[in-house]
Each structure stands twice: as structure tokens, then as C-alpha cells.
């Protein structure tokens, strides 16, 4: 596979402490520059609507970087300035699933993406 024009997006499962909530994310993705990626995060074992779901990422050799978050019951997301206009975070209360979509992908977006509560 030619990796020159493709970037790897890896997502990882995270387990919340409160109420033994488990967050399960969608799998790894390979995307072309300029395209977008949408990652899902399904919660189980606790109340979904009332607690904030945050999205963070970790690029190779770097620390964690907060991208944004949402409280499902309110429906309005907050974003880090760096990602304004490129990231969209949503939540579907009916399926207890949060989503993070990142558009206009660049090589610098190669990272492990996590949802957390």
C-alpha cells in the first residue's frame, strides 16, 4: 500500500470510571488528504445524556490534545480554537453514541483519537 498520500487514524476504546461507563469506538481508518473522517463512540453501562463526552487525540511522540466536547442533553458542542471550522462533534441520545468528524485532513492529523467521559 502506498502510504504517501494516506494517513492512519487509529481509535481506541476507553473506559469511564463514573458508573462503570464503557465507551467503545469505531476502528482504525486510512484516509486521503483533504478528505474527512467520522469516528463514533458508543456508551453503555450508565447515563449518557447528562455527562460531557470529550474528544482528544495523541499524535506520534506528542501529548494529549483536547479537540472538543459535548453534553448530549444540551446538544451544543464546544471546540478547541485550533479545530474550529474543521471538527464537528455530535451526539445521538437514542443510541447513546457520540461522533467526531474531522474534515480537510492533513498529515499533521495522523494520531490516535480518543473519546472520554
UniProtKB/Swiss-Prot annotation:
Stretches for region Complementarity-determining-1: 45-52
Which SUPFAM superfamilies does the protein's record reference?
A: Immunoglobulin (SSF48726)
Does the entry feature the keyword Iron, yes or no?
Answer: no
Q: Which intervals of the chain are annotated as region Complementarity-determining-3?
A: 116-117
> Could you tell me where this protein is found in the cell?
Secreted; Cell membrane
> What are the start and end residues of every segment in region (Framework-1)?
20-44
Q: Which SMART domains does this UniProt record tie to the protein?
A: IGv (SM00406)
Query: Which residues does the record list as Pyrrolidone carboxylic acid (modified residue)?
Result: 20
One biological process term from GO is:
immunoglobulin mediated immune response
**Quick one: where's region Framework-3?**
78-115
Source organism superkingdom: Eukaryota
**Ig-like domain: which residues?**
20-117
Task: State a single Gene Ontology molecular function.
Answer: antigen binding
Keyword tags: Adaptive immunity, Cell membrane, Disulfide bond, Immunity, Immunoglobulin, Immunoglobulin domain, Membrane, Pyrrolidone carboxylic acid, Secreted, Signal
Note whether Secreted occurs among the keywords.
yes
Where, if anywhere, are coiled coils annotated?
Answer: none
Q: Give the matching PROSITE patterns.
A: IG_LIKE (PS50835)
Q: Where is the signal peptide?
A: 1-19
Which Cys pairs are S-S linked? 41-115
Predominant location: secreted
Residue span of region Framework-2:
53-69
Described by its record, this protein's role is as follows: V region of the variable domain of immunoglobulin heavy chains that participates in the antigen recognition. Immunoglobulins, also known as antibodies, are membrane-bound or secreted glycoproteins produced by B lymphocytes. In the recognition phase of humoral immunity, the membrane-bound immunoglobulins serve as receptors which, upon binding of a specific antigen, trigger the clonal expansion and differentiation of B lymphocytes into immunoglobulins-secreting plasma cells.
What's the protein here called?
Immunoglobulin heavy variable 1-69D
| Source organism of the structure | Homo sapiens (Human)
Gene encoding the protein: IGHV1-69D
Amino acid at each position: 500500500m502506498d502510504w504517501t498520500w494516506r494517513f492512519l487514524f487509529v481509535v481506541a476504546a476507553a473506559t469511564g470510571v463514573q458508573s462503570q461507563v464503557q465507551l467503545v469506538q469505531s476502528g482504525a481508518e486510512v484516509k486521503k488528504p483533504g478528505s474527512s473522517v467520522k469516528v463514533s463512540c458508543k456508551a453503555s453501562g450508565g447515563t449518557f445524556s447528562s455527562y460531557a463526552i470529550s474528544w482528544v487525540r495523541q499524535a506520534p511522540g506528542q501529548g494529549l490534545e483536547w479537540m472538543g466536547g459535548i453534553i448530549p442533553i444540551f446538544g451544543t458542542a464546544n471546540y478547541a480554537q485550533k479545530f474550529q471550522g474543521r471538527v464537528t462533534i455530535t451526539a445521538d441520545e437514542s443510541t447513546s453514541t457520540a461522533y467526531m468528524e474531522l474534515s480537510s485532513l492533513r498529515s499533521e492529523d495522523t494520531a490516535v483519537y480518543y473519546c472520554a467521559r
